[in-house]
Amino acid sequence: MTKNIGLFWLKDDFRITKNFALIEATNKHDQVVAFYLFKEKQFENQEAQKWWVRESLKEFEKKLDLYNIKLEIVKTDTFKSFFVKLFKKKNYSIYWNRTYEPNYLKFDEFLIKNFKDNEVKFNLSKGNILNEIGEIKKGDGTPFKVFTPFWKNAEKFYLEKIPSKNKKIIKCKKKVSFFNKTINTKEIFSQKKWFKKFESYWIPSEQRAFTELKKFINSGIDNYSE
């Protein structure tokens, strides 16, 4: 275990199960802080999304509490302006999961370069996908052009590299803070109250997602359109 704090950048991966960056952070640090960057302008005309994010953060925070991990929400105009300040800080390592949208992939390159330049240890983990882009290739290194052999190889590749069940999120020794200016989930609210009706339809949480998936597999998949 390293003595400095492990920072986990929470993006859109509100899950405990197979959260590889969070697993890596807690396996290497006694103290871990999860942080979420709230870009208020992004949600100016997205009240439904704001509600979903707030409720997801509330549920995820409860899960993190079980592991003595504090969730800190930082309000920022842009990701870049936040990280430019973070580069100057010391005594931390940072972990995050890859997001596969082009803008995020490009931003990862910016982060990697600057963390290296500032001698900050970092770990970029696989996102919520089966295999990374470009991992599945033919013996000669070229991409598959027919689906069936591609899928057979993709399945075999995935099953062979499933992480050990022994590697999981470890409970930290104590809960600590890292950032000076933070907000709480109550400050992420909508001026309009029409979102209240959502609460009768959806419960944003990892556990609810598993429940709905199980229900679909047991009773819905047979009637699902081909």
What are these regions (language model features)?
Residues M1-I162:
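Trp/Phe/Arg-rich N-terminal binding region typifying the photolyase-homology
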Residues T148-E226:
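Glycine/tryptophan-enriched, flexible segments
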